[in-house]
């Protein structure tokens, strides 16, 4: 596609709000943006004389992006607010090359109390609880369960959600049996108020726990004392040491960004009743370190942290600095939560001090990250294999089966120098050959890009054929993901797997690479492949055991192994065999065998 074609596309832009997308010569998505007026916004990227080129008045990052752009697409929306929400969704799902993606798809827990209950108690939730008299505390980015356990350990509140008579907790003085009316509502409320005060003031809770730990140790109950010691350590880790006096007992949130040495640091303070009760920080390596866009980051950060299904306790959000779409975000959040939400930049006073503190901590977190993690290998991979992204988030895929039995796939995740086991995935597969199995696994993962953002790199256990397959799937999604594959060298058209002699080759879209066995890049990729292989084999073995157990049940009915395999090949799994219609079974394996299955 030529620049002439792009110039013609620019002429079709409407004077309405919407989202625009830039693509390169290979059809890869470069950038997603939103506009109040698509025609004016998109044309501001270009200069038109003597011919079409990047506007020199824009940043170097934008100029470089426009130089690569050969095609644009756009979607109109009813308003700029709708465009901003759609833009954020596209960035998360498609991971464009020149957009910065904040990888935090977690929902964090809140502790809440339902005052509609006769004797309220603390519970944990990650979503909005649709009841009228709920008080929330949080979100807590870590340690919510430990806090809750500590509260129930020290304060004799109702321990069970439903209980009709005094239980073991009453016998050990951990509950005052409100279920049996052994405590008045007024006295119970006094204890609950003390517990809520302790929740907002962890130092109070710590003092109480330390006293209890000492008593247990003196009574030689060392096991329980050790549990409390661990709770104390967790709660101490939650405490935020702030020498700023927030005079008012108010609720608000604080956000700050810092950028240094190609690292983006985001930080969030949650303030309730004038106390910082929770802190969340995140480090994101920037893949295109020419420049970064604070407006883009603040938009993502605030929209992702305040999704529609969570409680928003504060009505004021303070940010460290001004950004372009601040007022628009105010409007979106106010509509989303049906109340007035303000996003402010404080100039003086305690709010300015706390914003400055958030920024200072964001900078410190970058320094800590760089001391703790070495990104040398990622930089070497990016340079050597000419990757578009710095591969900090890597997904590795492998399949496992035994002659078409117990077909499974596995995905493991390596994120910023460590395994992220919370994102490991297992797949039961329908297909029997390696190619179709990998297609099934990769397609299922790609379909989840809108829920779990794509990584920087896919590593496939296989050769060029599977590499091309992965490329086809990624191109179909429009996502910006680099791809590598690792396979054993072939001798006489067969993979050479002799112990001690097996040599791996790396396949990229740029070609095939044979690296020295001592090469750190090869060893790193082998480590990733081996973990995926281990995970896939383990899942295959467990699946095979379960299938063997179920197969033995059918064998006990007098069905031959051939009949069982025929049934599995047709129905895919044992559950479908048992649920199958008698007529269908009879047509496949005969009436006698079908009758045995249905009768048992």
UniProtKB/Swiss-Prot annotation:
Q: Which SUPFAM superfamilies match?
A: C-terminal UvrC-binding domain of UvrB, GIY-YIG endonuclease, RuvA domain 2-like
Q: Which CDD domains match?
A: GIY-YIG_UvrC_Cho
Q: Name where it mostly resides.
A: cytoplasm
Q: Which residues form the GIY-YIG domain?
A: 15-100
Please state where this protein is localized.
Cytoplasm
Cite the Pfam families for this sequence.
Answer: GIY-YIG (PF01541), UVR (PF02151), UvrC_RNaseH (PF22920), UvrC_RNaseH_dom (PF08459)
Q: Name one GO cellular component term.
A: excinuclease repair complex
Record has 4Fe-4S as a keyword = no
* One annotated GO biological process: nucleotide-excision repair
* Key word Transport present: no
Q: Which GO terms describe its molecular function?
A: DNA binding; excinuclease ABC activity
List keywords of the entry alphabetically.
Cytoplasm, DNA damage, DNA excision, DNA repair, Excision nuclease, SOS response
The chain positions of domain UVR read 203-238
Q: Which family does it belong to?
A: Belongs to the UvrC family.
> What is the documented function of this protein?
The UvrABC repair system catalyzes the recognition and processing of DNA lesions. UvrC both incises the 5' and 3' sides of the lesion. The N-terminal half is responsible for the 3' incision and the C-terminal half is responsible for the 5' incision.
Recorded hits in NCBIfam families, A to Z, give: uvrC
Cite the record's note on assembly. Interacts with UvrB in an incision complex.
| Protein name, as recorded | UvrABC system protein C
Origin species, per record, is Campylobacter jejuni subsp. doylei (strain ATCC BAA-1458 / RM4099 / 269.97)
